[in-house]
Amino acid sequence: MTATFSTKPVLIPALALALSIGAAAPAGPAIAQSAVAEGERLAFDRGKGNCLTCHEIKGGDLPGTIGPALKDIKSRYPDRKDLVAILYDETKRNPQTVMPPFGRNRILTEQEINAIVDFLQTL
């Protein structure tokens, strides 16, 4: 005798579970866009990232001219680790720099530095 089993009762709850998990998971591009927006906010914030004090950034008001213009960043720094290191503590690479060590001095958190890098890589 051959036993026959119906898979329909199992498939419906399994499908519902899979759909609910997929619906609850945040979308990758939405998270990335959120980080870029937060990075832009920090870069333009005169009290936090304050990139505009020294750098020209597209869309920023009253930019400084001490540092280089922040454009074509992804082509200049294809490895984001390099840019993270610069923001964290540029004095390790260039002891004569006037760039503040944002990470070492705890001006910015690691998460904030990464958000700014996400933003800069869109320029």
Regions found by a protein language model. Give the residues of each.
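N-terminal export/targeting leaders of redox proteins
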Residues: 1-33
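Extended, non-globular alpha-helical segments
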Residues: 1-12, 82-101
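N-terminal alpha-helical segment
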Residues: 35, 62-66, 95
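C-terminal capping alpha-helices of c-type cytochrome domains
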Residues: 81, 86, 92, 104-123
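Electrostatic cytochrome c docking/interface patches
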Residues: 26-46
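Gly/Gly-Pro-rich "capping" loops immediately C-terminal to redox-active cysteine motifs
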Residues: 44, 52-88, 104
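Cys/His-enriched microdomains
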Residues: 49
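Positions in alpha-helical segments
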Residues: 37, 68, 97-101
